[in-house]
Amino acid sequence: MLGEKGGTPVCGIIGYTGENNAEEILLQGLRALEYRGYDSAGTTVFDKSGKPVTVKCRGRVENLAQKAAKKEISGTCGIGHTRWATHGAPEEKNAHPHASRSLTLVHNGIIDNCVELKKELENDGYEFVSDTDTECAAHLIDREYRRLSSPVKAIYSA
């Protein structure tokens, strides 16, 4: 969010892994972080089989909570994000988390060369569903993971 005297855009990010219901904890955390962005919000919780279940919405965290309640999400590990739009309009498709084949990602910041990266990744066969720079990061890390077979090396290489 932009501060009263300008400043830089910010977002709220939360992660959880433990024994309790991750969705409830993520939503509670996002409510506390909502001042950092209220254009859109989203969560991804990994169910008992490891499958990611993602819920996104435009607007405030309470909208997300209502949407998530309809899905009856159950899992003990997940990530959440509340967004102040920097790349892409405040629309559901631009809400985080973003996914690429092997990973799900939230991000706070601006990727200056995302236009060039997007063209490169599209040439490599990646399809984009959002207008965000974060989706570029997700696809780039995925591409490097496929090349290097190490998540840590892939992140550093990206």
Predicted segments, located by residue:
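Conserved short alpha-helical segments that host acidic/polar catalytic motifs at enzyme active sites
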Residues: 2-158
